[in-house]
């Protein structure tokens, strides 16, 4: 009798953990239900006026797994070989994440390509890629913009939050020589590490994470363990500027030091005092612009 009770209890516990893990995966990774479009972030009146005067082209590619992915392109005012590819973060969309950055880069003569990540904005997709699937999409966008302009380019990849993880994960792949440098703002070391941190912060039982990791490959198309930013960064040959706020509790600040130390390419590090997650530019735009400019000038011809 006791053996039957133990067996039944074990099976029931396993079922509950498995079901709870699937619920946790879907909560973190499933595309959110269509909500009212979030307003653009932290725009001044001058920013709003400037933005209202710009014309954006709409571009589209098909991902390797058949999704229609869409992007906005803001062309430079004059002939230019400089392109910024700007990758937004989790539960955001292209223009919302980068509206306050656009004028800075545009005034420097950049064409600016802003994709909507899979399962975000105008792009298709049921599950969020957390940078791992997006790294391949990012490389497709690089090739698409090369074909669009049909010339040699100087490409800078800029990512914020999950977008930062995307460009860093892409850096571990073979990138075209047109990619000159990366600006990485508040990226995480791996999907597993970020999930672990968020579970702890949200008081979700950590026992769910190993099971969720086992189930994630089948559920969302990648394992939380394999989706490692830090392992990709170790392979990177692309000069990278790492930016992080010292008050970030969503992607904890220690992660940027781990990423910086793992990077064997040319690199620099900016820690912005008083900045929470994805707030570095908002807290200190002058410092961020100065540091980005100095870094880019080493690798991009102006």
Language-model-detected regions and their locations in the chain:
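Conserved alpha/beta-hydrolase
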Residues: 104-124
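Hydrolase active-site cap/lid region
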Residues: 169-223, 231
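Short beta-strand/loop motif that positions the catalytic acidic residue
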Residues: 235-237, 242-244, 248
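An N-terminal hydrophobic leader/cap segment in hydrolases
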Residues: 7-62, 72
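Alpha/beta-hydrolase active-site loop
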Residues: 128-149
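Catalytic active-site module of serine/aspartate enzymes centered on a nucleophile-bearing elbow/loop
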Residues: 283-302
